[in-house]
Amino acid sequence: MKKSIVAICLGALVLGTLTGCFAGKSTASSGRGGEVTGVGGGRAFREPAPYGMTLVKRGWLRMGLEKQDSLWGKKTPVKDISVDGFWMDETEVTNSEYKQFVEWVRDSIIRTRLADPAYGGDESYMITEDKNGDPVTPHLDWNKRLPRKPNEDEQRAFESLYVTNPVTGEKSIDGRQLNYRFEIYDYTSAALRRNRLNPQERNLNTDITVDPNEVVMISKDTAYVDENGVIHSETINRPLTGPWDFLNTYIINIYPDTTCWVNDFRNSDNEIYLRNYFSNPTYNNYPVVGVTWEQANAFCAWRTEYLLKGLGKEARYVQRYRLPTEAEWEFAARGKNQDEFPWDNQNVKNGNGCFYANFKPDRGNYTKDGNLITSKVGIYGANSNGLYDMAGNVAEWTSTIYTEAGVDAMNDLNPQLDYKAAKEDPYRLKKKSVRGGSWKDPESYIRSAWRTWEYQNQPRSYIGFRCVRSLASSSSEAAKENKKSSKKKRR
């Protein structure tokens, strides 16, 4: 009887402990004079749910393949890790969404040329001063519409972005001119103690005498376009002089490489995809391919710029769009139960014989799952995190550099291994982790923990991407807010 009473008491104690994990004291101040009660921070920022994204709540994961690959004898690192919550695109970025990026870049070039004296010099397309008449850095006025009936100079500005094939006579946009310039501030490098501007802050060990004349060298990415329209990207090593040294500049040609359909499959008749996959509206809701890791990052930067221009003062709280880390991707793909696949069993077909994903079921048989190449995004069921196509369709870029050590070389808190390869670096240092498998891959490659890689400048017909965005706040309250995103309309 005593044992029963003790067991009941212990059970009640444990239950009370669990239910009261976050039942701490209220943070409301009493306002008592002379006491430290904290300052009023105002109303907490309620982050609006991003369109087409779903919330992946923070959690724990045993990352990697626990069952090692017996076929190749390849060992995959396994490690327990934790990641913070983040927003993630429900589907891969589609042709339609990427076309919006392409058209924005096209229109920005047209507006810039309309303001150029060589094309008429209409200065109203540029904003050069603020509302008070004070000068500002010149930038485009997107509120001014492009002319519907252009004059001769304006027509030349429009025509300058198009080319005519001398053989077929086809007129199309000149993708070689579609360059997007963006800047990324490297907060991590700027925060490193060794990069402090004040020498006294670089080492807190009072036994060490700090050299006030020490020269700190930093690496800075920069880029420019020469008079022939060629992009030159450089990594400069120079002495640290100020906070601007951590602002990196990139210029990326953003038009997808449609020739990847031919180059990826030699002795194969894929001309139809080369000509139609990106340009034909039939493929609008298919995942964009032929996009390099560098172009995917440019899209994330543009998407951030596009969003922030539409927000008010609260824009400072919103985090930038980016590619997921390798750890975030696997955590999101494996769902709430850490499944081997993005569904709740180890089969690739459901009870009705329907496949869970678009992949290559049999040798030489791409169509067994109902598809030949890619499929429309979101036609297969979502995983427990509300994410579609986390297995198959197209493999996906991550932000993480690929190494054999994988997660073993990373921290167990928000793991990431980042390396900004300079142009002169060996090519092997430009490998980026790719996850998820694709329409051309067998079953074993679409497992959520399967790792592979591709060079960051290599476009493929089977690699796409999706974006993530860190939560504006990682507090328990924030994780409960806005669970549902504004859903995409699927066609």
Per-segment meaning from a language model:
Residues 102-109, 471, 475, 482-486:
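Pro/Ala/Gly-rich low-complexity, hydrophilic intrinsically disordered segments
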Residues 25-33, 55-56, 62, 67, ...:
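Functional-site microenvironments in short loops/helix caps that host divalent-cation chemistry
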Residues 45-120, 134, 139-143, 147-280, ...:
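A short glycine-rich, aromatic-capped structural motif
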Residues 41-43, 76, 420-422, 451-456:
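Short, P/G- and charge-enriched loop/turn segments at secondary-structure junctions
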Residues 461-476:
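Short, structured beta-strand segments at or near domain termini in extracellular proteins/domains
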Residues 34-47:
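A short, compositionally biased domain-edge/stem linker segment
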Residues 19-20:
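C-terminal motif of bacterial Sec signal peptides marking the signal peptidase cleavage site
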Residues 1-8:
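Bacterial N-terminal signal peptides that target proteins for export
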